[in-house]
Swiss-Prot record:
Source organism phylogeny: Bacteria, Bacillati, Bacillota, Bacilli, Bacillales
Pathway: Antibiotic biosynthesis; bacilysocin biosynthesis
Protein name, UniProt field: Phospholipase YtpA
Pfam families: Hydrolase_4
Gene: ytpA
PROSITE patterns, alphabetized: LIPASE_SER
Amino acid sequence: MWTWKADRPVAVIVIIHGASEYHGRYKWLIEMWRSSGYHVVMGDLPGQGTTTRARGHIRSFQEYIDEVDAWIDKARTFDLPVFLLGHSMGGLVAIEWVKQQRNPRITGIILSSPCLGLQIKVNKALDLASKGLNVIAPSLKVDSGLSIDMATRNEDVIEADQNDSLYVRKVSVRWYRELLKTIESAMVPTEAFLKVPLLVMQAGDDKLVDKTMVIKWFNGVASHNKAYREWEGLYHEIFNEPEREDVFKAARAFTDQYI
């Protein structure tokens, strides 16, 4: 993990990246938070980015949750309000992390286009085959079926990703089955967010995540303080879109009110 320190810190934000990516794709967002007075804590999830494990493969989704737990422990050492921002699969990790805590001890949570359902549907035969392969060949990798231009309209980001050797393009059968299992778990109603301020920020033209499932989850989650905002016309990676400064302002307005 890494820490980017603000000159006059008022809070700490822990950022959890999504599938296939890593911390290097968040340079703009990290600097926006840092220059706004937030220490930023972030790392690469297991099997992604600069981690030494097999890229695109995990044994269990719990590996992600355990890793993020260490990041949050680091954030707490600053004795400042701690916020959690999870994007896409990182949002799913954030949800499951909160559910596992008796007392989350975080000031607020932002979910950016959280992965609570997939737009791209795997055909039934391949899905059935993956169940068997998950037992006999869990590390077998297949093409993710995702293209970079499905995630953002930002041409600069698209060009950078096309030449990025750390961008994961193949995932294991085990990774796929663990993702589906965790999505199913996350959709079970929970009171874990009852006392945690929650902001869900969803791309209006999301080509990766099924936003109807995000709305369903949001409507079903018990919380004394929750808000949903949808960004019309924006693709999945709202913090990379041409309108990202407006998106960031909305995220910061949410966190600032709890400092």
